[in-house]
Amino acid sequence: LRVEKQAVSADGTALVRAGQEIEYTLRVVNVGSSTLRNAVVSDPMLGLQDAAVKPSTLAPGQSGELSVKHTLTQEEIDSLSVYNQASGTATPPRTDTPLEPGTAEVITGLSPPSSLLVAKRHEPLDPERASAAGDTITYYVDVTNNGTRTLVDVTVADPLIDDARHQVGDGT
């Protein structure tokens, strides 16, 4: 018995954000010389425990399969991959004892973009008078994460500002 597993984006696009779906196809292949019955797969991440493949009775060389979707979490996006393992078994003729489980694993690489948008602005100066040396100019630097990965320890450096104070927003 051989277990195979394949993962593809359910909508055919790159896997880049939480909420997208991966479609897993789990396949059990009879590589022996006897017909096997009750072919099932188990995959804890996908919530499968002894789920029957179709067909569940497999002649030599025949395979049965089952497809299941998994919705990506933000944690998976941030880790850049999803590791998943499945097992499968079937029962040979003239016994009620299933074969030792075969296993298959797949690591799905994710490609979320990391991107920051930085915008710098200042408070308007008094339009009634000319600017002079020593005037205080208040600058604002807005940093927005417009990618799909969670970013941590983001810092802003500006060589023109020597005593900058910062206020952290909501982190999104």
Where is each model-derived feature located?
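Exported/extracytosolic protein signature
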Residues: L1-T172
